[in-house]
Amino acid sequence: MLFRSEADLSHYRQELKAPREGARGLSSYPHPWLMPDFWQFPTGSMGIGPISAIYHARFMRYLTHRNLLDCQGRKVWGVFGDGEMDEPESMSALTLASRERLDNLVWVVNCNLQRLDGPVRGNGRIIDELEKLFRGAGWHVIKLIWGSDWDGLFARDSENALLKAFANTVDGQMQTFAAKDGRFNRENFFGQNAALSQLAQGLTDEQIDRLKRGGHDLVKIHAAYAAAAAHRGQPTVILAHTKKGYGMGQAGQGKMTTHSQKKLDESALLAFRDRFQLPLSDAQATELAFLKPSEDTPEIRYLHTRRQSLGGYLPQRQTQCDTLPVPDLTHYASFALQPEGKEMSTTMAFVRLLGQLLKDPVLGPRVVPIVADEARTFGMANLFKQVGIYSSVGQQYEPEDIGSVLSYREAMDGQILEEGISEAGAIASWTAAATSYSVHGLAMLPFYIYYSMFGFQRVGDAIWAAADQRARGFLLGATSGRTTLGGEGLQHQDGSSHLVAATIPNCKAYDPGFAGELAVILDRGMREMLIEQQDVFYYITVMNENHAQADVPASVHADLLKGCYRFAAPPSRVKAKAPTVTLMGSGAILGEVIKAAALLADEGIAAEVLSVTSWSELARDGMASDKEALEGGVVSTPFIHQMLANSQGPVIAATDYVRAV
C-alpha cells in the first residue's frame, strides 16, 4: 500500500509540478488512472455510481453463488447526493436491488437540499420524496434527519409543534435557515407560534445556531450505519440531512454560491478555526497548515486499531492479480482459422468461439457472458443449457420449452448474466466483472454482446467510466453492418460506434471481416488482459450476414493485430504492366471489396486487397510516429506506410462507418 503523504496533499491538483518537488500530488477527483494505487472508482458522471453500486453488489452474489469467491460479509457502500437522484440511472435499478434482496448494499444519500444552481426541491421536500421512492421500490429506509441536540426539544414537544413546523417547511426555506444565524432562526423558525417559542426558551442564539442536522452528528451517524450494517433481506438507504458548506458560516454555509467557493479570506479561516475549536494559531490557520495528531495520540491509535480490525487501510487499489492461462488458439478456433470456405456470419462464429472457451476447465469458469435480452437473436440459446442463466433463487418454475435443447434454464450457479431490456444494467454488470481483478483480486473475463447501435451510442458515458476504472474485457457490437441491416430499420444501422470507440485511449477497436480474424483478435486480447495484465478492453464488431469464410494463416496474424494485412494479390490473369489499384476494406464491406477486385481484374486492372481489421489502431500507430517526430527522437515508419510502400496506383478505402473513422 502506497500512502499519500503531506507532501502529496500540499500538491493538490499539481500533479505535474509535484515530482519535481519530491511528491506525487493529489488529484481533484478520485481517479484510478491518476492515482492507480489508491482510488478504486472514479466519481463521474453523475448517476453512474448508483447503478454501478447495485450491479456490483449483485455481481458479488454471482461470484459467491458460483463458488468463485466467498463475498459473504462484504458490503458495497455508495455515497451519493440528493441532486444526483434526478439522474435516470440513479433510480433505474432500485427494484433489481430489492428483487435480488441485496442486503450487501448500503446507499448513503447526502441530503443537503442543494444543487449547483439552487435547491434540489425548492418548493418541495426531497427527503420525503426519496423516502417514498425507496420504500416503494422495496428498500429499507433509515432517515438521519436531526442531531442529538434536538432530542431534548422533541422530548418536551408535547404538542408535536416541531414535527408540524418541519412538515410545513419546504426545502428552499430550510436552505435559508441553514445559511442564517441563530438569531434569524429564533425569529423565523421558532417564532412561528407560541409552542415553538416556548421550546426555544433557555437556548442562546449560539446554541440555536449549533443545532445539528443528523448528517453532522457522529452519534446519530454511527447509529444509522450500525443499523444499516445489521439489516438483512433488503438493500438499505440512509437519507442523511446535512448543510452544504457545513461550518463555513457566512462564507459559504447553505449559500447558493457554496459550490463555486474557491477560497476563504483570513476572517473566514479564523472563524472556521474557532467554529471547530481547532488547535491552530492565527498564523497557522491563515497559512492553511495541516493539523495532524501525533502517532501516539489516542485518536491515531484508535484509527490504526480499527483499520487493522477491518482488514486494512482504505482507499487502496490492487493493480495486479494472479494470471490466468489462455488455451492455445488452435484448441478452440480451428474451425475459424481454416473454415474451408464454409459460410457463416462472424456473430455466429463468435458464439461458437465463446461456447468453446466456456468448456475450458481453467478459463471457462471465469468467463462472464452478458446479454440484454438478445441471446436468441445472436444464436446463443444453446448456451442456456450448457452453462445456465444466473438467478439468485434458481428456477422455481417449469419453462414452457423444457423439452427443447434450447430450453431457458436458470440456476443459482448459472453463468450467463441475462439483464433483460437494460443496456445500462448490462454495462454495469460488465464493468463489475471487468474490474474484478482489481476490486476482488480475481480475474474475470466478461463478454457483453449487444446490437452494435446500442452500445457506445446508448451507454457511452458508462463505457468511459469503465475505461476510467481500467476495465479488462470484451464488448461485442453484434449484427453490425449498416448496409446489411437495412431490414431492421435505420435506427439499427450502426455507422458510428467505431468513431466513438476510437476516442477512448485504452479501448482497442476492431472490425474483422472473417471468423479467423476475430479468433486471432480474441486470443490476443485475452493474453493481453489475463497474462500480461494490461489495462485495456476490446470493442469488436461482428456481422449479421452469412458469407464464405477465408483461411487466416499464422503468417498474417501479426499484421492483422496491427490493423491490416495483405489479403489478396492481383489475380494472375491480369497483365504484368496493367494499371494497379489498392483496395482496403473492413467488416461488412470487405466482401464487396473482394468482389470489386474481381470486377476490376475483368477490366484489366490489377487490384490488391488489404483486409483492414482496425482503422483506429492504424491511426494510433501513425499518431505515435508523429509524436516521435515532434519529440525529436528516432521516428519509426507508420505501419500503414509500410503496407502501402509498394503500391503503384490509387488507394481506395471502404468501410461501413462514417468517414471520420
Regions found by a protein language model. Give the residues of each.
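Catalytic-loop motifs flanking and including active-site residues across diverse enzymes
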Residues: 1, 47-54, 89-90, 264-268, ...
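Conserved short loop/turn motifs at secondary-structure junctions
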Residues: 80-83, 115, 119-122, 372, ...
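Glycine-rich phosphate/pyrophosphate-binding loops
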Residues: 60-70, 435-455, 474, 508, ...
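A structural-propensity feature for long, helix-poor, extended segments
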Residues: 78, 85, 461-482, 487
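Cofactor-binding active-site loop characterized by glycine-rich and histidine/acidic residues
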Residues: 1-100, 123-124, 380-383, 396-433, ...
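Non-catalytic terminal/interface segments that mediate subunit docking, oligomerization
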Residues: 4, 297-472, 533-534, 555-579, ...
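A short, small-residue-rich loop immediately preceding and capping a beta-strand
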Residues: 39-42, 69-87, 105-106, 367, ...
